């Protein structure tokens, strides 16, 4: 009788500077959208778990806000605290960087993981965007020189290239243990939380360069009526002028934000969604620790 293959399970922090593809990687490993994605830095503001279950084991991925040096505003400080706090009790860390680029914030992220005393896997994302493929090996040699990594994985999270080997090596670092979550569970966050994040994703995608950072979303109502979810979302901004921009001429932009958010919710929740959205002003909320706490920032 052959021995049963050991089952490995543990928590893995996904750490890196802003906009390296941490959330895209988390979603790719989970196989579902649990973390919102945009091409803007600092899209992720909250710590959340993505649960990736395989026959050989289970990865409990701790997706975090991007670590950054500048901490002038309360929002930045809260996000850095969330990222650092995610390392408590984890079994391993994924340092996600962008192929061809290493800067001070990458060094900061590496140092945070190193100081946590856990095995660190280097994940070099966006290799599909490298114009000079021959530059990858010298870049890897430069980054790994003098730094201790358990393994190094060049990948494309968006195209799902290189993930199989990554999963295999990360599972090998985790303790032999039964799964922490059921096979059908993909995140520890509620549908209510995810609904707010999906609205915020559309704000990040549809608004100008700076305005998304002055917005947050609060779900005021979330009720189930058979196969229908009734959701009321408040978009908070910091100034009246910003409110007008979010609403758009004749309410067109707000309608577009609502329509695309609703479609994403229906896809994720597998139910019909009736979504209402409003825009309200709370001056200076992103630099106000009390306001951030009221909006659910850790």
Curated annotation (Swiss-Prot):
Task: Give UniProt keywords alphabetically.
Answer: Cell inner membrane, Cell membrane, Cytoplasm, GTP-binding, Membrane, Nucleotide-binding, Ribosome biogenesis, RNA-binding, rRNA-binding
Compartments in which it is found:
Cytoplasm; Cell inner membrane
Q: Where is this region: G5?
A: 155-157
Q: Where does GTP bind?
A: 16-23, 63-67, 125-128
Q: How does it sit in the membrane?
A: Peripheral membrane protein
Residue segments, region G1: 16-23
GO process terms (BP) = ribosomal small subunit assembly
Q: Kindly indicate whether the keyword Ribosomal protein belongs to this entry.
A: no
Q: Name one GO molecular function term.
A: ribosomal small subunit binding
Q: Where is this region: G2?
A: 42-46
NCBIfam families reported in the protein's UniProt record: era, PRK00089.1, small_GTP
The record, for PANTHER family, names: GTPASE ERA, GTPASE ERA, MITOCHONDRIAL
- Please describe what this protein does: An essential GTPase that binds both GDP and GTP, with rapid nucleotide exchange. Plays a role in 16S rRNA processing and 30S ribosomal subunit biogenesis and possibly also in cell cycle regulation and energy metabolism.
The UniProt subunit note reads as follows: Monomer.
Q: What is this protein called?
A: GTPase Era
- What organism is listed for this UniProt entry? Stenotrophomonas maltophilia (strain R551-3)
């Amino acid at each position: 009788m052959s021995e049963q293959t050991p089952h490995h399970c543990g928590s893995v922090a996904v750490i890196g500077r802003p906009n390296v593809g941490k959330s895209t990687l988390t979603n790719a490993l989970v196989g579902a959208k649990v973390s919102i994605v945009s091409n803007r830095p600092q899209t992720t503001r909250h710590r959340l778990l993505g649960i990736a279950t395989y026959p050989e084991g289970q990865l409990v991925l701790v997706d975090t806000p991007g670590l950054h040096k500048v901490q002038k505003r309360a929002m930045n400080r809260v996000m850095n605290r969330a990222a650092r706090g995610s390392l408590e009790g984890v079994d391993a860390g994924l340092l996600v960087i962008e192929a061809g680029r290493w800067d001070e914030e990458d060094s900061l992220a590496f140092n945070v993981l190193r100081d946590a005393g856990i095995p660190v896997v280097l994940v070099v994302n966006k290799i599909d965007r490298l114009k000079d493929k021959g530059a990858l090996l010298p870049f890897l040699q430069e980054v790994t020189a003098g730094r201790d990594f358990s393994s190094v994985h060049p990948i494309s999270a968006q195209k799902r290239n290189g993930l199989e080997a990554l999963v295999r090596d990360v599972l090998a670092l985790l303790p032999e243990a039964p799964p922490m979550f059921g096979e059908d569970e993909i995140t520890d966050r509620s549908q209510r939380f995810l609904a707010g994040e999906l609205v915020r994703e559309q704000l990040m995608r549809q608004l100008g360069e700076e305005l998304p950072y002055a917005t947050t979303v609060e779900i005021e109502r979330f009720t189930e009526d058979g196969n229908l979810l009734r959701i009321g979302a408040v978009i908070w901004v910091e100034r009246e002028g910003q409110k007008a921009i979010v609403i758009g001429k004749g309410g067109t932009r707000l309608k577009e934000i609502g329509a695309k958010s609703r479609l994403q919710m229906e896809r994720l929740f597998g139910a019909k969604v009736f979504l209402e959205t409003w825009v309200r002003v709370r001056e200076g909320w992103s630099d106000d620790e009390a306001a951030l706490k009221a909006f659910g920032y850790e």
